[in-house]
Amino acid sequence: MKNSVRHIIASVLLVSLLWADVSVPQTQQSASARADQNRKFQPQLVTRAVRVINPPARGSVTTTLKGTELAPNASGEAKLKMGAVEVTIEAQASGLGTPGSYGAQFETYVMWAITPAGRVFKLGAMEAKGNRFELNAKSAVRSFAIVVTAEPYQQVTRPADMIVLEVVAGDQTVAASYEFLKGAYAPVGYLFSPLDTGAGYPSQILQMYNARRIATLAGAKGNDNFKMGDELFNSVISSAERQKKFTDVILGQAVSATQYFEAARVKVVGI
C-alpha cells in the first residue's frame, strides 16, 4: 500500500471521530437538537415494481438487464442455467460508475433475487473487473426478479431503493412488486462525510465504517449488537496498527463487525 498503515489508521480514526460530521440545511433548531434528531432516523419503505423471470424447467436462459434512471448508461445480462436442484447465475454489467457516485455512504453493488411472493434473497456483491462488474451465484429459487442496488456494505439485509439495474420486461417475465428501503439510510438533506477511498483501504474496512455510522444514525449505539460490533471495530484498528497491515483475519473481523452493526440497526428500526 502506498501509505503506511499508521497513516491509514490515523486517518481512519479521524473518520471515526467524525461519524456525526454532516451537512444539513440550516434550521432554527440548535446543532445538538438536529444531531439528536438525526441519530434517531427511522427509515421507511417504498414499493417498487419488478419483473420476475419465468425460466424454462431445464436448459438456460439469458435475460437483459437495463440501467435505471440512476444509471442510464448501464447495461448487462444474467445467464440462468437451470439445474435439477438449483439455478446457476452468471451476471455481468458495464456502464456503472463507482457506488460512491451516488453518495459517500455507498461502497458496493449488491444483486438481489425477489420472488413473486415478495421474498428477497441476496445473491451477492458484484465484483469490479476492469470497467465491468461481475457476479456468479446460485439460487434454490427458480423464478425471481433480479435487481442490482447501490449499498453501503454487503451485509445489508434489505435492498435500498437505489436500484441501478433491473430486468427488462419481456415475454418471459411477469410483474411483481417489493418494498425497498427508502432514503439512502439518512434523512433528506443529510450528507455523510466522505471516506478516503483513494488511500488504498480494503473495501471491508470502508464497509465496516459505513455500517457503524449508519447504525449510529439509527440510534443503535446502546444495544448489545452495536457493542459487539464496536469491540470488533476497535480490535480491527488496533490489530492493523500493530501488524502494519490488514491481514485476512483482520478483514474477517471487519466483516463480522459490519454484521453486528447491521443487526443493531435492524433491531432499532425494525426494517
Residue ranges and their predicted role:
Residues 2-12:
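Bacterial N-terminal signal peptides that target proteins for export
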